[in-house]
Amino acid sequence: MQHITGLAPFRHLELCVGPGVFVPRPETEMLAGLAIDAATTLVQEGVHEPLVVDLCTGSAAIALAIATEVPQARVIAVELSCDAAQWAECNITSMAAQVELRRGDATAEAVTGDLDGIVDIVVSNPPYIPPDAIPIDPEVAEHDPAMALYGLGDDGLAIPTAVAWRASDLLRPGGLFLMEHADVQGKAIVDVLLGQQSWVKVHDQNDDAGRPRHVVATRATSGESS
């Protein structure tokens, strides 16, 4: 339906969507909620301007939800696709939201290297579908861009793994990483993060349907290990 109306509800927002951008799904609202709760906690603890980075932002759904629900936060969104970035820019402008949009590879130091080691929260809904999987939802299969769907590699985890590496550089010690994945990838993505040896408190959280959907990890401090 969103592809017909050009509008997609997301938490309290109504986003403009169209050709070339992934339409956000309900499970991603939960991911945004985790980031919002974490940013809110930081504000309550006295952090003046929590720094949140949304990698692979697409329509800017997560970034906008955070910026509008935690106005004290500084939110930076990164998107590689020119088409998706145009939709993100349109949504940010229409809502007059305080979100900085950066165009480029979310896994590249050249795009966000100035933020290394100072970010409080990194959140991402990257492409993660395995190459041989066909999306069950026909709207996804027929309308959403392949670039936003398929995570590359034999298991679809090549891009999520690269995002996790980038997040480990961006986050300050003790910073929080949140990332969506396919329900069949729960154990695999946890193993990936444990193998990177940059994370502690690595665990997976289920979506509202009880399926593994979001990996959560804390950037290790010096001397900590997973």
Q: Where would I find each of the regions flagged by the language model?
A:
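S-adenosylmethionine
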Residues: 72-74, 78-224
